[in-house]
């Protein structure tokens, strides 16, 4: 039976019920709905709606219901209830009779679902923080293992300057640390309790909402009942955080897909995160990474979905807001599995140091060093840049690296070039000169790694 049937003389059509009911989605809020109901029973006991005996009986029945259903979603969905709130109330009435009908006194599904959703976001958000920390640790471990492997750094997907593989790893550590910080901030803003604000105007019963909030683990209650039931900022913010983090995951996946390709051959992925072809026996496909990249789109879609849903709603609850959960749940599921999978990929990744070093020595990645050499000889940088560009064109025509041009050939571009030029054109010199904070010299990467390990 619906919770609102008294106003109506006709039953809902089967099509409307199918269209309107949210239980197949919001059954995932069973724990939060019951926990919130237990707290609400205590709150209305304190204002005289329930006796202590009645409160105890409701608490016992609600805890029994939680034990029966927490790991059995099929039992919830099979009930045919309109939503998770209806399911809990109907199940409670079946257990304790008319006493169960008292529980909703002073409460609306509007503040109830807002509370459920914030409780769920808080719980899932903490789990996501753990997964982000695990991925961060996996990157730090990989950076430590391969800290001095030399590889080409790219701009425009063209070899630009040599870097250390450890430097590449720590670049993504920075990104995922920002993701952690953003999610922590979002969870702080979500840490306010909606319960006790009613449908939109507040509850008519003089309960202690501060005490109620604390009993549910919130830092404080919300302060405006109208805003409270209108608000889905926490959903939007978490979906936004997930979208940024998935963008980072997708970029890392793209890098690794390229590094793993036959054209690069920089890394080897473990068999446990790859698959083969049904036709081509030789294939070993980076499916885990490609799926991370692919799932990013659905997370972006959910963010745009909830933003579009909320953009023109008048204040207080509107049924449009029922559409918040399906996207949120999918976002959190996708983000979670991608974080776990990324950490697994990194744990088994092997670097082919011979190939990365060979690639770093190609593509005239030491050209900037030659320009800096000329600057040290007194030439303005813009002029040095032009001179080196001409030298590179000549080297390309001769199909030889810059460092293999003869001194006479180099001096044809500038008389400032002397025999000591060859010392600055080595890979070792290119890396060692990047000594400023944040650079890719081995000492800087070691310092950065030590700092990250201290903060784990």
From Swiss-Prot:
The keyword Transmembrane does not apply. GO terms for molecular function: argininosuccinate lyase activity. CDD domains: Argininosuccinate_lyase. Pathway: Amino-acid biosynthesis; L-arginine biosynthesis; L-arginine from L-ornithine and carbamoyl phosphate: step 3/3. Keywords: Amino-acid biosynthesis, Arginine biosynthesis, Cytoplasm, Lyase. It is found in: Cytoplasm. One of its GO terms (cellular component) is cytosol. One of its GO terms (biological process) is L-arginine biosynthetic process. SUPFAM superfamilies: L-aspartase-like. Pfam families: ASL_C2 (PF14698), Lyase_1 (PF00206). It catalyses: 2-(N(omega)-L-arginino)succinate = fumarate + L-arginine. Its EC number is 4.3.2.1. Its main location: cytoplasm. The keyword Cell division does not apply. Belongs to the lyase 1 family. Argininosuccinate lyase subfamily. This is Argininosuccinate lyase. It comes from Shewanella pealeana (strain ATCC 700345 / ANG-SQ1). The lineage of its organism: Bacteria, Pseudomonadati, Pseudomonadota, Gammaproteobacteria, Alteromonadales.
